[in-house]
Amino acid sequence: MTSTPVVALQKPKGISIEEIESELRNIWRTQDEGATAPVATRATTFSIVVYEPEEFQQLLAALTFYKGDIDGQHGNKTREAIRQAQMAYGLRVTGRIDEATLTRLRQEYEQLADSQKQFSNPDLRGFNLSEAIAAQNPCRVITLCPTLDGDDTVTAQVSAYCPVQKRNTSNLICCEYISLRGSKASLERVSGMVSSLMIGDLPKFVWWKATPNPEQALFNQLFATSNCLIVDSSYFSEVESELNKIQEITESGKYIADLNWHRLFPWQELTAEAYDPPERRDALIEIDQVSIDHEPGNAAQALMFLGWLASRLEWTPMRYVEEGGDYGIRKVYFESSVGNREIEVELAAIPVADVGEVIGDLIGIRLSSSNQEADCCTILCSETTGCMRMEAGGGAQACRVEEVSAISDQRADLILGQQLQRWGEDVLYQESLAMADQILRLCP
């Protein structure tokens, strides 16, 4: 990705929350009074609130496992700190945060004396400007940074930055940045003020970088005043119940976008292409055996892909069976709309050696038929893991085999840049989510 140079119109400045609007007005007043080329003007595009808890980086820092910045970037330092904590506490070592690890970190943190709960790691939330967001020229970015302490105060910092566009160097289109820090309880108390900071007559986005919680006042306040709630289901700790929550919110008439859905695009595209030839398209109705492999820890991608496939082929979910075992096997049985045929789908969580930043990525898909004469067998697999397991299912020579190239843009903030260009509702996502919801409601 090409780097976008950014000019600081005003570097972060600490102020009281009551001074936010007046301080921002001062920035532009100063610019108007001393106007020389290049001219800086405020963008008139959209506002976005980013809820960035980063609880586990803070817990790891307080417990002395993590020495890096609190920045939301789950890179090598963060993964190594998680591994060290998991080894220290006798947990399964994965280098990823799961529910058991997070629960243990919280327990250990609560046992610390107040003086031990402090840490010196730089908190860069709200300061590490995402190029992907900056390139969309937002009008105002408001970052909410919950802290672990019980302090009742909320601190504020404001700044303004201007991406330098090569096509137009005489004018700078600039964005206001507001960062609010405080405990969860204190941020809850100022939720009304946060909503008022979003520019009234412009589109309003909320990027909720956590599990959606309709029982949380701050979530409800921001959600009610936004045009679009953006989530990333790869963050979800209990995928099944949380996808159900997302479906309930969608049914209420609110627009939700899931960044994890974008990660499925190459898989969907290759699946569709596999059945473009007329003779293969006619054999689609013969598919009655499906295998979907994904990385352990989060089944959101697998469930959404299955929701997409089943909704396109008009399958009706009938039964859901948890078989468990080393791969956490789950089976879903559908009824076809043509001929009342039964379709069996197997979802498996397959451990991989090279885990990436995103939890639960798809690694393999096999579509086939019990009718050996049907030309419908298709195998898709990640180029990083290969097709061996899927081909071992038999009949590989009669299958169309495709490798899915690794996506360089899988990081959430980069996908967000794409989402901010698409302000309309995604009907395909909504229909796929609705089908995934139907499947999950069959869970025993």
Residue locations for each model-derived region?
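Extended, well-ordered protein cores
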Residues: F127, E131-R281, T378-P444
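Short, surface-exposed connector motifs at secondary-structure boundaries
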Residues: T64-Y66, I199-K204, E286-I287
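Coiled-coil-based assembly segments and adjacent low-complexity tails used as scaffolding interfaces
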Residues: M1, T44-I48, A62, H74, ...
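Short acidic, glycine/serine/threonine-rich helix-capping segments at coil-helix boundaries
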Residues: K13-I17, R25-T36, T41-L112
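C-terminal structured domains
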Residues: M1-R25, D32, P38, Q111, ...
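Short, hydrophobic/amphipathic alpha-helical patches that form generic packing surfaces
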Residues: E55, A61-A62, N128-A135, E269-E273, ...
